[in-house]
Amino acid sequence: MARYRGPVERLERRLGVDLGLKGERRLAGKSALEKRPYAPGQHGQRRTKISEYGLQLQEKQKAKFMYGTSEKQFRALYKEANRKEGNTGSILIQLLEQRLDNVVYRMGFATTRASARQFVNHGHVLVDGKRVDIPSYRVKAGQKIEIREKSKTNSQILRAIELTNQTGMVEWVDVDKEKLFGIFSRVPEREEIAIPVEERLIVELYSK
């Protein structure tokens, strides 16, 4: 299954959560979800009871759409998380957080993960001094992520820096916003990752 490429604000309204897909509008308080916090369509404001399977599927969709992964990528990460010792759901979220496009987003070099993914694809990002153009590349603790020299005047990146200065950084990255580089200092604990996803339901879905 390919990545979702439809209207992202309709998707957020359908799932009922801010997925961080419209960065600038969200930061400006203009997101459609804030204005119309109900599902799109003629019957969007009606309350409907969702089945257990529906809830499980919804949580998987939230995580997939939020981090911008395909079904194949997401399932592979779940299988890897399931093989590791510890809480499978928490490990899954930690693996998603280690994606290069997500780390670029967390460092404030992009207003959305989709923009960060595009920057990586276009070769704007270096990892330990070497260009990496694979958004799913797994960043390890201690690695340096920077915007390459030729891209430091990119208007989208500079605009992202300006906007994300208002929101602050997460605890597990150290960023120099003047020199446009950051260190992924450690893998965050699950409780530090503020995303509206109940990964327990994802584990239940894949465990069937």
UniProtKB/Swiss-Prot annotation:
Ranges where the S4 RNA-binding domain occurs: 98-161
Top-level taxon: Bacteria
One of the GO biological process terms: ribosomal small subunit biogenesis
Keyword terms, alphabetized: Ribonucleoprotein, Ribosomal protein, RNA-binding, rRNA-binding
Intrachain S-S bonds: none
One GO CC annotation: small ribosomal subunit
CDD domains: S4
GO molecular function, one term: rRNA binding
Subunit structure: Part of the 30S ribosomal subunit. Contacts protein S5. The interaction surface between S4 and S5 is involved in control of translational fidelity.
Reported function: One of the primary rRNA binding proteins, it binds directly to 16S rRNA where it nucleates assembly of the body of the 30S subunit.
PANTHER family according to UniProt: 30S 40S RIBOSOMAL PROTEIN (PTHR11831), SMALL RIBOSOMAL SUBUNIT PROTEIN US4M (PTHR11831:SF4)
UniProt record similarity statement: Belongs to the universal ribosomal protein uS4 family.
Protein name as catalogued: Small ribosomal subunit protein uS4
